[in-house]
């Protein structure tokens, strides 16, 4: 567990993989923290448990710490787990846009042969297939998901089009054409035991892992959806440094786990 420490020093000395946005974050911290932070300001690293929403973590922390200004540096769907960078206090919530620029790493599981409208396990089934790809076909498909590529955002996403969020249109049964977005990714096949396909992915801001699973299924000709997801890193912050989000209410001296730029 990371004890209370200077955030800038933590980012600079971290031996974990560095985020491309690290220097930007440190610079913004120096500009933003013109006044000394209170003892209830800083960054709290939480391992979000399955079933909880990102907002529910914010709500729990507001109640536990008695601090109204709490945000995060990237949401996770309810079925997903892993690193949530919680920003506590005004001096840190104002930096959320900078933290959102950080690259991220995930361990993902795709379920082959079933396509859903949301591209994940929470959606309605649209189609099924009995095609069973070979390991060689899997490896060939993964070779196409490396480096700089273009990705079409899913309909069930918060991106706006026609003045509305895409998921609002999707819930009305409206499907609109979406423009592809340039992203940078590196994928690594971990295991394949049909219908389960497990892989690691490092990606730039704005990457939809659900779309990666969907696009993999399309390339393989069998269809697929994202069935499990764990965020293992967000910028310089790693899963092993996170508090268990299911134990927020029972952790003693929770404020001592705040990472600060003292």
Swiss-Prot record:
**Listed GO MF terms:** RNA binding; tRNA pseudouridine(55) synthase activity
Give its E.C. classification number. 5.4.99.25
Q: Which GO terms describe its biological process?
A: mRNA pseudouridine synthesis; tRNA pseudouridine synthesis
**Signal peptide extent:** none
Keywords assigned by UniProt? Isomerase, tRNA processing
Q: Where is the active site?
A: 77 (nucleophile)
Q: Which reaction does it catalyse?
A: uridine(55) in tRNA = pseudouridine(55) in tRNA
The question of whether rRNA processing is a record keyword is answered with: no
- PANTHER family the record matches: PSEUDOURIDYLATE SYNTHASE TRUB1 (PTHR13767:SF2), TRNA-PSEUDOURIDINE SYNTHASE (PTHR13767)
Protein family membership: Belongs to the pseudouridine synthase TruB family. Type 1 subfamily.
Q: What does this protein do?
A: Responsible for synthesis of pseudouridine from uracil-55 in the psi GC loop of transfer RNAs.
Instruction: Name the chain's protein.
Output: tRNA pseudouridine synthase B
Species name: Protochlamydia amoebophila (strain UWE25)
């Amino acid at each position: 567990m990371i004890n209370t420490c200077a955030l800038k020093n933590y980012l600079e000395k971290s031996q974990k993989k560095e985020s491309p946005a690290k220097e930007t974050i440190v610079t913004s911290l120096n500009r933003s923290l013109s006044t000394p932070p209170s003892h209830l300001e800083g960054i709290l690293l939480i391992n979000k448990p399955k079933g909880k929403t990102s907002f529910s973590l914010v709500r729990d922390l507001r109640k536990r710490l008695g601090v109204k200004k709490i945000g995060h540096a990237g949401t996770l769907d309810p079925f997903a787990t892993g690193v949530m960078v919680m920003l506590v206090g005004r001096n840190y919530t104002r930096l959320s846009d900078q933290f959102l620029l950080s690259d991220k790493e995930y361990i993902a599981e795709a379920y082959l042969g079933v396509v859903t409208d949301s591209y994940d396990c929470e959606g309605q089934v649209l189609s099924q297939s009995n095609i069973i790809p070979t390991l060689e076909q899997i490896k060939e498909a993964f070779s196409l998901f490396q480096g700089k590529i273009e990705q079409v955002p899913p309909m069930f996403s918060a991106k706006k089009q026609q003045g509305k969020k895409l998921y609002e249109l999707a819930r009305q049964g409206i499907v609109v054409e979406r423009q592809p977005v340039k992203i940078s990714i590196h994928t690594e096949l971990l295991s394949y035991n049909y219908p389960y396909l497990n892989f690691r992915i490092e990606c730039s801001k704005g990457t939809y892992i659900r779309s990666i699973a969907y696009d993999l299924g399309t390339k393989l000709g069998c269809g697929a959806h994202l069935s499990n997801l764990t965020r293992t890193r967000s910028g310089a912050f790693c899963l092993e440094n996170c508090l268990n989000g299911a134990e927020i209410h029972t952790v003693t001296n929770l404020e001592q786990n705040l990472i600060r730029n003292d």
